[in-house]
């Protein structure tokens, strides 16, 4: 049994993973069942909730082909870094709605030192009011000194997605390298900030690219892996892409779980438009979701997510230490 091999500690190879992913003779729901056995072993029926705040929007020199905030987009919502009270208001909402992780996101290549100070001061205030709330910062490319300030302020996690495979990266963006992204993740790890890194599927990548992404994140050892499904933005390079089906999304999530068995696999942007009515099934592979809106696209109403989890018989987990430690042999 595939799931039992993985639970026993075996890392599946690229060759086997790719074969599982592309073989039409392997039923999607059989593959999803294997993923669920692994998910259940590490997380039971628990689900982590995350919420995003778009704290700075549309001001960016990068040319990412999926992004409505890139330098190539003319009609976009632009604003500078919001004040502390607005950021803290989002934290208050999280604390009263069983949302365990609050993600503060900024557009741009990377933050200025002044912006890092602003975020750090605000995070300190949030931690004073809500010490159990996990704070994830997503500010772009950073340096070691900035990472130290964020750690000291109480930032628990830092998100910087690899977005795609190293082989496909230059088709997605040309203003920074794949290694730039990996370097930022490594800086955070060196400063004992939990690394969060994920992908965007549906940008024209190959099946092999999908598997390469999951394997790269295994090598990076990201604690949290958001899996985004492209929600095409009109006017972007990938604005006309339409190659995802709900079933393909389920296969992708299954492979990310099987390749990264103990990690937090989060269904992120684009789940509503790509998974559609199969969103509940996706929770058999994933153990985490974003609630509320995304950066520039709308999510579904919160009450639908809470109701979905209730109907599934899943339990909201706001304590990130609740992973099955026996399973991890800690």
Swiss-Prot record:
Residue pairs linked by disulfide bridges in the UniProt entry: none
Pathway it works in: Cofactor biosynthesis; biotin biosynthesis; biotin from 7,8-diaminononanoate: step 2/2
Domain Radical SAM core: 42-268
The EC number(s) this enzyme carries: 2.8.1.6
GO biological process: biotin biosynthetic process
Annotated residues for binding of [2Fe-2S] cluster: 103, 136, 196, 266
Cofactor note: Binds 1 [4Fe-4S] cluster. The cluster is coordinated with 3 cysteines and an exchangeable S-adenosyl-L-methionine.
UniProt-recorded Gene Ontology molecular function terms: 2 iron, 2 sulfur cluster binding; 4 iron, 4 sulfur cluster binding; biotin synthase activity; iron ion binding
This protein's UniProt keywords: 2Fe-2S, 4Fe-4S, Biotin biosynthesis, Iron, Iron-sulfur, Metal-binding, S-adenosyl-L-methionine, Transferase
Secretion signal, residue range per the UniProt entry: none
Domain of life assignment: Bacteria
Cofactor dependency: [4Fe-4S] cluster; [2Fe-2S] cluster
Family: Belongs to the radical SAM superfamily. Biotin synthase family.
NCBIfam families, A to Z: bioB
Subunit structure as annotated in this protein's UniProt entry: Homodimer.
Protein's recorded name: Biotin synthase
Species per Swiss-Prot/TrEMBL record: Macrococcus caseolyticus (strain JCSC5402) (Macrococcoides caseolyticum)
